[in-house]
Amino acid sequence: MATFATKLGQVQAALDAAGLCFGHGYESAHDEAVALLLAAAKLPAAQSTALLAEPFPVEAEKRLSQMLAVRCNERQPVAYIVGEAYLAGVRFLSDHRALVPRSPIAQLLTEGLFPWWAAASSPRHIVDVCCGGGSLGIVAATCFPEATV
């Protein structure tokens, strides 16, 4: 029986070989492989690296194969396949009806908008306009809890 580590290497190699683009909720073939493995095994995203030594569940093999085929052949984003994406550490449900939460602006928010905003104060009002599903507004609200978003 293959371990999670073995499966991780296999799935990552398949994603790399498929010539896919990354950055739709997951930044690399490795990140996408982890997400697919955990979703196929029906495990939450937060896992210890000790899981890598554990056997990959036999009952998850078919789900993993189907998910990988959809990603590689149909080019669907992993966020749609697994139903979630993370932006600045915030979990968002995700499917084909909305854009995958992703934006380099999220990093600016987590860094307190430095160097564009004075560190001694926080913004009082933040507007998320025409940025997709409102994910940047949600991230802003977590980064600046005293602001009206």
Pin down the residues of each PLM region.
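SAM-dependent Rossmann-like transferase core, predominantly class I methyltransferases
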Residues: 52, 62-149
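N-terminal auxiliary segments of SAM/dcSAM-dependent transferases
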Residues: 2-87
